[in-house]
């Protein structure tokens, strides 16, 4: 029997301190139950496939790619780039795209902010808030810097 969790019913963009063992443990449980998807600084793509092929491979539910791309602010041309040409921010957006196409209700973003510029972080936070509202998902930003807990875009847990 699966252990119930309050986090599975949440919708919004939440900050979780990396050292909050209770919440991170609960989120790890969601990952192990395949109820959540993890977004990392390094996109774990299949190395010998193109970016577009990686996206197509991960899009098992057959969601309409072009409908979701505007929500992650990613042009179709980014999917035609070589994997080595992608910026860390583009990799992050591709992972957000894949998470939305997978139709999971919970997305975990862990330790990615240090790979982004200040401007990219300023773009990412409202973007995640908007995605959470538009797709009725819970997005958890797991990070050690609590300054992200006090933005107008996140709810601190």
Question: What residue ranges belong to the model's regions?
Answer:
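Glycine-rich P-loop/Walker A and Walker A-like loops and their local beta1-loop-alpha1 context
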Residues: 1-36, 113
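ABC family nucleotide-binding domain
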Residues: 19-23, 62, 84-85
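Q-loop/switch helix immediately C-terminal to the Walker
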Residues: 41-74, 82, 95
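Walker B catalytic motif
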Residues: 82, 108-117
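GG-anchored amphipathic helix commonly corresponding to the ABC/SMC/Rad50 NBD signature/C-loop
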Residues: 89-108
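Conserved catalytic loops of ABC-family nucleotide-binding domains
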Residues: 103-105, 117-149
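A short helix-turn-beta junction within AAA+ P-loop NTPase domains corresponding to the substrate/partner-engaging
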Residues: 151-157
């Amino acid at each position: 029997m699966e252990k119930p969790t309050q986090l599975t019913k949440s919708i919004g963009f939440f900050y979780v301190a990396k050292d909050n063992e209770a919440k991170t443990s609960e989120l790890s449980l969601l990952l192990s139950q395949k109820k959540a998807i993890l977004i990392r600084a390094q996109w774990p793509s299949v190395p010998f496939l193109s970016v577009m092929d990686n996206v197509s491979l991960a899009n098992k539910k057959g969601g309409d790619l072009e409908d979701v791309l505007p929500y992650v602010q990613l042009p179709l041309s980014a999917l035609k780039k070589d994997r080595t040409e992608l910026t860390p921010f583009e990799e992050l957006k591709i992972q957000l795209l894949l998470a939305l196409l997978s139709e999971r209700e919970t997305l975990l973003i862990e330790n990615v902010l240090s790979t982004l510029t200040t401007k990219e972080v300023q773009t990412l936070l409202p973007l995640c808030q908007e995605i959470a509202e538009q797709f009725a998902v819970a997005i958890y930003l797991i990070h050690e810097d609590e300054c992200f807990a006090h933005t107008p875009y996140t709810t601190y847990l």
